[in-house]
Design a protein with these regions (language model features):
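Acidic/histidine-enriched active-site and ligand-binding environments that engage anionic O-linkages
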Residues: 148-157
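ATP-dependent carboxylate activation and anion-phosphoryl transfer catalytic cores
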Residues: 7-16, 20-24, 48, 71-73, ...
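A structural signal for short, well-ordered beta-strand elements
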Residues: 59, 112, 138, 171, ...
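N-terminal phosphate-binding caps/lids of nucleotide- and nucleic-acid-binding domains
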Residues: 122, 154, 167, 187, ...
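Conserved short loop/turn motifs at secondary-structure junctions
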Residues: 81-84, 106-110, 134-138, 166-171, ...
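ATP-binding N-terminal substructure of ATP-dependent carboxylate-amine bond-forming enzymes
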Residues: 1-125, 135-147, 397
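Structural detector of well-ordered beta-strand residues that form the stable sheet scaffold
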Residues: 29, 79, 101-103, 131, ...
Length: 448
């Protein structure tokens, strides 16, 4: 087992990693910026190292400082969490070449899956269903591009190969605007990602976002841990997630899940990962793979009983996954609300001091958060301050528990998006299940 781990992150995920390390008897090193001296996990870690000023670029994205922290504390491994450097192949490479274990896949696999074109090709080869598209980057031959668009069928979407988070994409509904749209997306991609490679895909009008959680070890084992539905989104950012996805049968789950597990073995995957799909009319279409732990991992933990972060640490120690595929049984239903320090009407961040805090409790209620009364939410980072997760034997119970838990939650001193969650959970279409990825934005358009 690993002896000492550097937690190269902040906030709730850093605390989540610290808890898993403590349960396994692993010593922890919290690296932090000058703005984060009072973070919960920093106060609880065995050792702490300040790696730079408040700006992420000079601290949490500062590769030499993080590796130096591992060196001075004689750590074995670095856990990147999510966000920041978690999907940075150069970081993974430097961690391993400096003699430490990167808790995640190899740099080569991160590179392969980080480039959308190579990822789609790898998935097709492994038998994972993909969105019909250009099968590679678009050339400057407009006649050829028009031909591809005709074959796929309008509407189509032009996407940047190095893009993500909703940037570098443009929907095209007819041939008249195709040439201009490709040129504009290329220019945007060059400016944002320093890579003007773009590709074309069929644009699905009303899909759901359904993703498959996987784990793979270094002994040739890979398992899938059911699916999550993350369709409740605003500006491509997930707001509410749930597991399992409403309406997905065990047979469908087994088919898509086993394909993902097989793909993990074929690409030499290691650790926790997620295959993201668009799901429309009973069909799955692969969009990307996240080569890290995800924000919404707790809903999967609640319905499977597996501690995903502990499994990450075990796999990084060279141990096999602690269970077999047939041991995984989906039981009950879980819902997660991402609680952000933001104005619920304008969505602008609302940093500041938490004056009073009362977190909810009771049967089937989980509160993953680093905040406490007296803690100041800094303005420099992502606005998520907590994740509230509820579990029930059926979906209706999980939703009702979430409504109760939200009504119990008191966070005074800053604004939060709890009113938005109340609105979503009260919505009759959400309660029925199966809303698509555009639903929330349309609903908010009606409420503005």
């Amino acid at each position: 087992m690993l002896e000492k781990v550097v937690i190269a992150n902040r906030g709730e995920i850093a605390l989540r990693i610290l808890r898993a390390c403590k349960e396994l008897g692993i010593k922890t090193v919290a690296v932090h910026s000058t703005a984060d001296r009072e973070l919960k996990h920093v106060l609880l870690a065995d050792e702490t190292v300040c790696i730079g000023p408040a700006q992420s670029a000079k601290s949490y994205l500062n590769i030499p400082a993080i590796i130096a922290a591992a060196e001075v504390t004689c750590a074995d491994a670095i856990h990147p969490g999510y966000g920041f450097l978690s999907e940075n192949a150069d970081f993974a490479e430097q961690v391993e070449s400096s003699g430490f274990i990167f808790i995640g896949p190899t740099a080569d696999v991160i590179r392969l899956m980080g480039d959308k074109v190579s990822a789609i090709n790898a998935m097709k080869k492994a038998g994972v269903p993909c969105v019909p598209g250009s099968d590679g980057p678009l050339s400057s031959d407009i006649a050829k591009n028009k031909e591809i668009a005709k074959r796929i069928g309008y509407p189509i979407i032009i996407k940047a190969s190095g893009g993500g988070g909703g940037r570098g994409m443009r929907v095209v509904r007819s041939e008249d605007t195709l040439e201009e749209s490709i040129a504009m997306t290329k220019a945007e991609a060059k400016a944002a990602f320093n890579n003007d490679m773009v590709y074309m895909e069929k644009y699905l009008e009303n899909p759901r976002h359904v993703e498959i959680q996987v784990l793979a070890d270094t002994h040739g084992n890979a398992v899938y841990l059911a699916e999550r539905d993350c369709s409740m989104q605003r500006r491509h950012q997930k707001v509410v997630e749930e597991a399992p996805a409403p309406g997905i049968t065990e047979e469908v789950r087994r088919d898509i899940g086993s394909r993902c597990a097989k793909a993990c073995v074929e690409i030499g995957y290691r650790g926790a990962g997620t295959f993201e799909f668009l799901y429309e009319n009973g069909e799955f279409y692969f969009i990307e793979m996240n080569t890290r732990i995800q924000v919404e991992h707790p809903v999967t933990e609640m319905i499977t009983g597996v501690d995903l972060v502990k499994e990450q640490l075990r796999i990084a120690s060279g141990l096999p996954i602690s269970f077999k595929q047939e041991d995984i049984k989906v039981k009950g239903h879980a819902v997660e609300c991402r609680i952000n320090a933001e104005d619920p009407k304008t969505f602008l961040p609302s940093p500041g001091k938490v004056v009073h805090l009362h977190s909810p409790g009771g049967l089937g209620v989980r509160w993953d958060s680093h905040i406490y009364a007296g803690y100041t939410v800094p303005p420099h980072y992502d606005s998520m301050i907590a994740k509230l997760i509820t579990y029930g034997d059926v979906r209706e119970v999980a939703i009702r528990r979430m409504q109760n838990a939200l009504s119990e939650t008191i966070i005074d001193g800053i604004k939060t998006n709890i009113p938005l969650h109340d609105l979503i959970l009260d919505d009759e279409n959400f309660q029925k299940g199966g809303t698509n990825i555009h639903y929330l934005e349309k609903k908010l358009g009606m409420h503005e």
